[in-house]
Amino acid sequence: MILSEALNLLPDTKGCVVILSGGLDSTITMRLAVEKYGAENVSALTFFYGQKQAFEIECAKLSTSMLGVCHKVVDASFLGDISQGFSANVDKNIEMPTIRDVLGDPRPPTYVPNRNMILMSIAAAYAETKNVDTILCGLQSTDEYNYHDTTARWIGKVNDLLSENRIIKIKLIAPFSSLSKYEEIKILQELDGNTDLLANTITCYNPGKNGYSCGKCPSCAERINAFLKLKLKDPAPYNIKITW
């Protein structure tokens, strides 16, 4: 996909709210939004919900600072509280799975119950206060370990609800939903000529105390494979040795 095609994935509107996790997908989504609308017309929301990979919040702060984007961090830690004993994403006593563990699982152990619906609702409230009608997110329906709340159908159902707003018809858009991480990184390369922005991202579900990615979890596996396919070195650090 060329850059002009990627920009056409975003609607022609005055600005947007980006749900920014601090990972690869949402960071490239934000970079594309800045190219389309200008940094002054982009606002980013990051959520803390008790996730093990809370280092990503600091990554989000760094990337928004680099791009000059308004950034808010929302405390949604109640999600982590109610998901104890259920989700490996928030419970320190539940071991993180490898990608082999989750392939074909209709509900991976990293799933946080109704997380995406809750976070999208908060983002919609924020978008309304900003008087913008577009929320961008980095959801991917093509993830090898699929969640029901990342699919095009799910996004369509959310938009059906959002369309009930009588004043601002807010719409949730996942511009990269049908793309691979490989294709996303290529878009960033065309935007910047490099992947330096991704040095301040973390995709890992189980980072070390130093903030480095584990290199073994499902998210790390996908990210590493994308860089290997492009014959590039990931600028983000890992706790295992990788031959790029």
Segments (PLM) and residue ranges:
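ATP-dependent adenylation/nucleotidyltransferase module used to activate substrates
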Residues: M1-N194
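A structure-centric signal for secondary-structure junctions around beta-strands
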Residues: T13-K14, L198, C214-C217
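Local cysteine-cluster metal-coordination motifs and their immediate loop/turn environment
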Residues: S121, T203-N225
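Glycine-rich nucleotide phosphate-binding loop and flanking beta-alpha elements
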Residues: D143, F227-L228
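Glycine-rich phosphate/adenylate-binding loop
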Residues: D192-P207
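Short microdomains enriched in Cys/His and/or Lys/Arg
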Residues: K229-W244
